[in-house]
């Protein structure tokens, strides 16, 4: 028996079947570093249009988690796809470095008794160390960026830039000092930004408290009565007993109806709608004597239950009837609505009672409760109310309450003198900041679109922005205040520039060690140098000013603007929000043209990641077990507009999909052995019809993928690439060409046509997967035939694909119909194989009984139809001749009959043919194979 294996063009490639990503990816990273890939991209991008994705800086604290990985991978996929689309797309990673979490870490490690200077020194060192760790982890994900020169908010230049940004906002007239209730954390000893507030369930004591009437005649008149026959009181309901000592007013809704209720020993004022529920709660019965609108109660005085002072009734639209009594007790120091209402009625700052100190302890001078921590004072306050006969009811409820994101402890609103950026303050010129910001939102594209309404609602309803903090590790607010008037120095903007120059050289320490006389001269004794620092959201929120202008100036006529900001959905109240406000205050537009929001990671059951649940997926572990490309493929395959489920099982499914794509790439490479595109590439017009279709199909898909990449629809990109590999290539084209590829002459037109198509497909595919499978694409790039540069990323989308000419006989619709026929044949073949009627496709003879139109289509392939169907024989007969045992198919006008071939099997091509053994020199092979070995070789026209 002759061994004909040597006469076949068997596939061969060094591209490994087993990816070994955990070992191979670090080697690829080293190669990128050694060739200076990022620098090369900047060099070739000099004359390209620029695309700027501005990095929202992660906090320089701790190792990265799966959310960080998701965020950075999404950004990297965009940067890579934009680069392949012909843009210069730099990526400058950033880090947020100041703020309480780092200061807290330093205090835990080194103690709280450090001096301010030492604290700042240790914070800077800690942040530097954390950045290095995170940087290594981000690079390991395959993120391509300028990691050698990242931006850090603690860089001296950026600290100075932040001061200059603040100076611009001061110059615009947006900054003011005011007493306002702000989110306050006792553990932080500082105000908190809205984005630093989390809501958790908390148990609180609720109390119904009676405030006795002081103006009896006015109350009687309000209810249309000549006098009050009994003692009367108005009843409030609150979940914060600790605020009762600071009560200064009582709020009713002007349009609600209030009732005067006789309960036997006294009269109570309650919202009419809530009378029944209140009396039930108090365990009493009563009769409504009269009703009056809330507006009739305005300015009637009641008495504080245990202090000798009055509490007037003020009208307020925020009073609700959902719970309580319809009357709100007002402590203006501890509630924003209370504060606003009391100010509206003329209360001045000096009259606002604020007995709670920054640590949560009442001032020592507070009668009854001085020196007590507010949460612990609640029972004492309840006891006092009981003692004076003012407590009508108390119970404990569990409700959602604001907590510090860092300490997980309850917060309060607390009125403090702080610096604010005013939302509705009239600026030096132009619209207010709220108006500017709302307009800017309308001019911004949102992905997904619902983000626009969300951010709009937040801006429309937000209070003034408290930008001052009482901490050490932060960029200073370099203001000098006149000791007598409390006003800013008239040369504040000029002085801020002088401070910025010093900070640029020495860092924020320059301000804290500055002697005021150095800048103010003889004026120094008249001014206080303040010690407040800026909210960290101002740090990151001004990076468009002090980073974009430096790293990649856009040349925008009114200031820098990035093409894209991309972060998690929590950043609508965080970085997107603060950046919008500062951008509109300085440049009167958003610092971004487009906002992309991704959801949070959850497990397969939709639960949040939690160590206690054991469902945490650590990116470091994924890198070490599956490889970063598997994680990248998971990111690409998931619709990021909602929650993104991830688990070991989900990642394993991504690994399975990866293997299918890799195996397709390996098949392409292995069949390009011996192919030199410089000499063997055929022009489109010389290629076989099926090969031309394959290249045309690749071109059409590339256009779709470019559109999906441009719209950041990575899950569509993944789905289409995966389906192309598995169905159109693996299930159709690659299956068909094996016979031609292996059995025809090595340099025959039939084989070179096929290899030309495979080469074009490979050149396109390697680019398509490059934004997602960053490592695998670059590995694949090294194995493709022909001269090429060092990395797939140094190229653009493949331009060698050709479209089928219009009117081409075997065009797109034709091959779609043939594909349907092939699917029908395969389906019936599986049934016959399962029944053991045939062993394999090449043992089968198929007869296709087709109606006229389909018969004409099938006839166009002539005797090459069998190669398309991968059967030894394929015969077409009229539909009406179909015997009773012919099988109907899902293809209209087609029935099939499959039988086992009676002819011998060719030892070379494995087809069962009647001419096997006809040539005495080759008794084991068919005539076609003899011709391919010893003759001129078979000629193919179609497939």
Curated annotation (Swiss-Prot):
Enzyme Commission number(s) of this protein: 6.1.1.5
Q: What's a single GO MF annotation on this record?
A: tRNA binding
Which first-to-last residue range defines the signal peptide? none
The protein's enzyme class: ligase
Positions with a binding annotation for L-isoleucyl-5'-AMP: 567
Q: Which residues bind ATP?
A: 611
Under Gene3D superfamilies, the record lists:
1.10.730.20, HUPs, Valyl/Leucyl/Isoleucyl-tRNA synthetase, editing domain
Question: One GO term of the cellular component aspect?
Answer: cytosol
**Cofactor field:** Zn(2+)
Name the principal localization, coarsely classed: cytoplasm
- Annotated residues for binding of Zn(2+): 906, 909, 926, 929
A Pfam match is: zf-FPG_IleRS
Compartment list: Cytoplasm
Show where the record puts the motif 'HIGH' region. Answer: 58-68
**What PROSITE patterns does this protein map onto?**
AA_TRNA_LIGASE_I
Quaternary assembly: Monomer.
Q: What is known of its domains?
A: IleRS has two distinct active sites: one for aminoacylation and one for editing. The misactivated valine is translocated from the active site to the editing site, which sterically excludes the correctly activated isoleucine. The single editing site contains two valyl binding pockets, one specific for each substrate (Val-AMP or Val-tRNA(Ile)).
Q: Can you name this protein?
A: Isoleucine--tRNA ligase
Lineage, please?
Bacteria, Pseudomonadati, Pseudomonadota, Gammaproteobacteria, Pseudomonadales
